[in-house]
């Protein structure tokens, strides 16, 4: 599955007041220091991995207070509901650093989580991802589209993000299964805005078209990293140009779709390579891009090559906006569907409908 560590979406049962924002999340959302500059200035550790180093020490701007299920009723309730419905979440499977914040919610935001469809086992083994892998995962649950749509409709959410594992063992990569889920959600709640973080479907245009015309509102597929690093970071079946083609074709068959992608920083990419990647994305008519820091999920995964400073994330946000992206979210702990982005995209989509 592509970029499972970059997702978010799905509000919990109890509504709370919403705050609509025009820009991405502030860096103050991610650090506890009085100022970003102070946190960076006081850090005495290395920012780049050097020869002979085992790993980099975690800098202060990446440290977050974890919210345990016992500490927040929203976390506990959502976990029980998802388990009862046999629904997987990428928040748990991919060890997302924002799980406690999003599942727990706050006074000015909804508790959120991301539903991961087609099981919790992927046919691909990307070197940055902690989701389980197998050549032949269990068969699809035929009741999953119905269960998922029923659950989401009962939660009363306005904006939902769905993601999935890769299923190269299926002829269509699972496109029919995912399409059915989206269509049932729209049937049960027509006003629901749906974002899907999708696989590349092994480059199959028919599967891409099935999803682009399914009724979803945001077609997301993550490029993950620059072209040079793609063979090293992603599963060999996940190709850089193949990802660009999927995003481009989705826009071609459904021009009103918002297309979206995400880039991890800190894997050894050069600035010129990031700029080329952004140029490739704009040439493919991608509307939204997010940047986040790669963080090693376990010792078996790729080492972090560089801690990218918050200031640098701000610079990439400004650079991307000048290229014409509709929306940019950039920060150390930003993931591809960070909730501030969801609220922003919700307003964009509503305005387009009116």
Swiss-Prot record:
Single GO biological process annotation from the record: lipoate biosynthetic process
Binding site for [4Fe-4S] cluster 1: 91, 96, 102, 337
EC main group: transferase
PROSITE patterns for this protein: RADICAL_SAM
Record's catalysed reaction(s): [[Fe-S] cluster scaffold protein carrying a second [4Fe-4S](2+) cluster] + N(6)-octanoyl-L-lysyl-[protein] + 2 oxidized [2Fe-2S]-[ferredoxin] + 2 S-adenosyl-L-methionine + 4 H(+) = [[Fe-S] cluster scaffold protein] + N(6)-[(R)-dihydrolipoyl]-L-lysyl-[protein] + 4 Fe(3+) + 2 hydrogen sulfide + 2 5'-deoxyadenosine + 2 L-methionine + 2 reduced [2Fe-2S]-[ferredoxin]
Keyword Transport: no
Positions bound to [4Fe-4S] cluster 2: 122, 126, 129
Cofactor requirement: [4Fe-4S] cluster
More details: This protein may be expected to contain an N-terminal transit peptide but none has been predicted.
Family in the record: Belongs to the radical SAM superfamily. Lipoyl synthase family.
Protein's recorded name: Lipoyl synthase, mitochondrial
Species this protein is from: Caenorhabditis elegans
């Amino acid at each position: 599955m592509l970029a499972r560590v970059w997702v978010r979406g799905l509000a919990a049962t109890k509504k709370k007041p919403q705050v609509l924002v025009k820009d991405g999340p502030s860096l103050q959302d991610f650090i506890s220091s009085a100022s970003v500059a102070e946190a960076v200035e006081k850090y005495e550790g290395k920012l780049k991995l050097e020869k002979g180093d085992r790993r980099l020490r975690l800098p202060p701007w990446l440290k977050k207070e974890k919210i345990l299920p016992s500490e927040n009723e929203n976390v506990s309730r959502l976990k029980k509901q998802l388990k009862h419905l046999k629904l997987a979440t990428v928040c748990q499977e991919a060890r997302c650093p924002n799980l406690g914040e999003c599942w727990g919610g706050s006074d000015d935001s909804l508790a959120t989580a991301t539903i991961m469809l087609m099981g919790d086992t992927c046919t691909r083994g990307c070197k940055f991802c902690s989701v389980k892998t197998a050549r032949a995962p269990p068969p699809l649950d035929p009741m999953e589209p119905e269960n998922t749509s029923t659950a989401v409709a009962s939660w009363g959410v306005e904006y939902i993000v769905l993601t999935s594992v890769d299923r190269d063992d299926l002829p269509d990569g699972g496109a029919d299964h995912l399409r059915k889920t989206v269509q049932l959600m729209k049937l049960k709640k027509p006003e629901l805005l749906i974002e899907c973080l999708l696989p590349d479907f092994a480059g199959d245009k028919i599967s891409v078209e099935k999803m682009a015309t399914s009724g979803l509102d945001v077609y997301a597929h993550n490029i993950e990293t620059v072209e040079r690093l793609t063979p090293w970071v992603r599963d060999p079946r996940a190709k850089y140009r193949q990802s660009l083609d999927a995003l481009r074709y989705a826009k071609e068959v459904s021009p009103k779709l918002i297309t979206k992608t995400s880039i991890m920083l800190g894997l050894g990419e050069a600035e010129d390579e990031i700029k080329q990647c952004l140029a490739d994305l704009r040439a493919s008519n991608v509307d939204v891009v997010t940047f986040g820091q790669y963080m090693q999920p376990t010792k078996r995964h790729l080492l972090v090559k560089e801690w990218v400073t918050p200031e640098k994330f701000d610079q990439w946000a400004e650079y991307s906006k000048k290229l014409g992206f509709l929306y940019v979210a950039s920060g150390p702990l930003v993931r591809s569907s960070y909730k501030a982005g969801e609220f922003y995209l919700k307003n964009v989509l509503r305005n387009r409908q009116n």
